[in-house]
């Protein structure tokens, strides 16, 4: 790699660029930016991991650490809100009751009055974990905490493994909901209204978790990268509006994920001709 960069630099100094293809132009521009320290590409490298080795398994240590931190925040907030329950709520109890009411309305709107109660804890947990994870990446200075192997802490949802795990949990949830409600008759949905739709219905079972996971991962990663680039280039007040926009989009992503999870579960349990 060093030989390639040295060759590019010598080429820039002593030769013409006209004979190089467009791809070489791009590589030369990026190498020049890196040499001039205007844009430290290595600081934005994605994929440096702090591994925890358990037997033959390698786990992403920073993802587990930040996930446990988010879970701890949620547990502390729940305990603080329920420690001294008042008839007239105030403070954090008032906030948590508002959040509970919001989550209840979200689950009811997706699943209906009769079916939403058993699934409220699942949908609510999804929303709260994703919401707090996203906001932790936007508000907390994770990168100031030094960890081994040169890795950097980030929001749990900044790791594709986290978003895939959440999406697979959602898939298991709507399979379980359908089988619990309809038994083996659930699989009749794959050939309705006509059997020729069977391949498409099977394909949907793969595309649903893929779309859920990559949508969440892509939005959170892109937001953090854009803010990091702007902070490097214009480290004053310019990135602040974009950071505020990032907080808004992070909340929207949590809402979208929880809403789609509820919609998929409702699709699995609804009967033919049943109104939502």
From Swiss-Prot:
Report the Gene3D superfamilies cross-referenced here. Answer: ATP synthase, F0 complex, subunit A (1.20.120.220)
List where in the cell it is found. Cellular thylakoid membrane
Superkingdom, taxonomy of origin = Bacteria
Under the heading InterPro entries, the entry gives: ATP_syn_F0_a_bact/chloroplast (IPR045082), ATP_synth_F0_asu (IPR000568), ATP_synth_F0_asu_AS (IPR023011), F0_ATP_A_sf (IPR035908)
Which key words tag this protein in UniProt? ATP synthesis, CF(0), Hydrogen ion transport, Ion transport, Membrane, Thylakoid, Transmembrane, Transmembrane helix, Transport
Q: Name one GO cellular component term.
A: plasma membrane-derived thylakoid membrane
Spans through the membrane: 27-47, 61-81, 120-140, 159-179, 225-245, 246-266
A Pfam family recorded for this sequence: ATP-synt_A
Q: Which GO terms describe its biological process?
A: proton motive force-driven ATP synthesis
Q: Name one GO molecular function term.
A: proton-transporting ATP synthase activity, rotational mechanism
Q: How does it sit in the membrane?
A: Multi-pass membrane protein
Biological role: Key component of the proton channel; it plays a direct role in the translocation of protons across the membrane.
The family annotation for this protein states: Belongs to the ATPase A chain family.
SUBUNIT field? F-type ATPases have 2 components, CF(1) - the catalytic core - and CF(0) - the membrane proton channel. CF(1) has five subunits: alpha(3), beta(3), gamma(1), delta(1), epsilon(1). CF(0) has four main subunits: a, b, b' and c.
> Which HAMAP family does the entry mention?
ATP_synth_a_bact
UniProt-recorded name of the protein:
ATP synthase subunit a
């Amino acid at each position: 790699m060093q030989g390639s960069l040295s060759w590019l630099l010598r080429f820039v100094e002593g030769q013409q660029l006209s004979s190089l293809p467009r791809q070489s132009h791009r590589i030369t521009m990026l190498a020049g930016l890196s040499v001039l320290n205007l844009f430290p590409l290595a600081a934005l490298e994605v994929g440096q991991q702090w591994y925890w080795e358990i037997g033959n398994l390698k786990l992403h240590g920073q993802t587990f650490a930040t996930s446990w931190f988010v879970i701890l925040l949620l547990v502390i907030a729940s305990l603080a809100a329920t420690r001294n329950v008042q008839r007239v709520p105030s403070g954090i109890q008032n906030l948590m009751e508002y959040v509970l009411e919001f989550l209840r309305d979200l689950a009811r709107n997706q699943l209906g009055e009769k079916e939403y109660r058993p699934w409220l804890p699942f949908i609510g947990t999804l929303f709260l974990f994703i919401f707090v994870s996203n906001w932790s990446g936007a508000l907390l200075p994770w990168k100031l905490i030094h960890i081994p192997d040169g890795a950097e802490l980030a929001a749990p949802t900044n790791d594709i493994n986290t978003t895939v795990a959440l999406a697979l949990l959602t898939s298991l949830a709507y399979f379980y909901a359908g089988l619990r409600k309809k038994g083996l008759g659930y699989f009749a949905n794959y050939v309705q209204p006509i059997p020729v739709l069977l391949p498409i219905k099977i394909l949907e079972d793969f595309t649903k978790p893929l779309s859920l996971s990559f949508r969440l991962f892509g939005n959170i990663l892109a937001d953090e990268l854009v803010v990091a680039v702007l902070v490097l280039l214009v480290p004053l007040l310019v990135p602040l509006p974009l950071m505020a926009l990032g907080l808004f989009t992070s909340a929207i992503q949590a809402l979208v994920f929880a809403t789609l999870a509820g919609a998929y579960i409702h699709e699995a349990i609804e009967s033919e001709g049943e109104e939502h």
